[in-house]
Amino acid sequence: MNQDPKHMGNVLLLRAAALWLLAALVLAWCLVGLDFGIPAFKAVFPGKFVRVLQAHLDFLVMSALLFGFYAAKVPLPWHVRWAMAVGAFTNSSLFLAQALFPVLETPEQAQGFLAAIFPIYLMASILITSYGFGKGAVTVLKSTFEAAPPR
C-alpha cells in the first residue's frame, strides 16, 4: 500500500472500517434470512428484528466515519485511532448483543452473567467511542486552522 509515512498509523482506521463493513454485509444477509422466515436465522437471532437492523446500520455508519477520518489524512494519536476502531465495533455490537440475547432488552429484569456485564460493556463502549471520535474530530478541526505549507 503506497501511503505518505506521515499518515501510516491511520491505516488502522482503514482496516477497521473494512472489517466493520464486512460485518454489516453479513448482517444484511442475516436480515434477508430473517425476513424470509428461515428458521436457522431466527434461532441465531431470537431477539427483535429491529436490533439486527440497528446493528447493520450502525456498522455501516461507523465504517463510513472511519473511512472519512482515514481520507482526511490528518495524523491521529495512536490512542485515538484505537479508541475509534474499538469503539466502532463495541458500539455496533451492543445492538447485536440484544438481537442475540433478548434478555438484555430489559437488563433490570434479567439475571446472570450477561445481564450483569451488559451495562458495564455499554458504558465502556460509549466512553471509548465518544473519546475516540470526539478527540478525532477536534484534531481534524484544529488541523484546518494550521498554516498550509508553502508550495
Regions found by a protein language model. Name each.
Residues 76-93, 148-151:
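Cytoplasmic juxtamembrane regions at transmembrane-helix boundaries
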Residues 45-58, 112-123:
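Short aromatic-rich membrane-water interface segments that cap or initiate transmembrane helices
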Residues 59-69, 124-137:
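Hydrophobic cores of alpha-helical transmembrane segments in multi-pass inner/ER membrane proteins
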Residues 9-34:
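N-terminal signal-anchor transmembrane alpha helix
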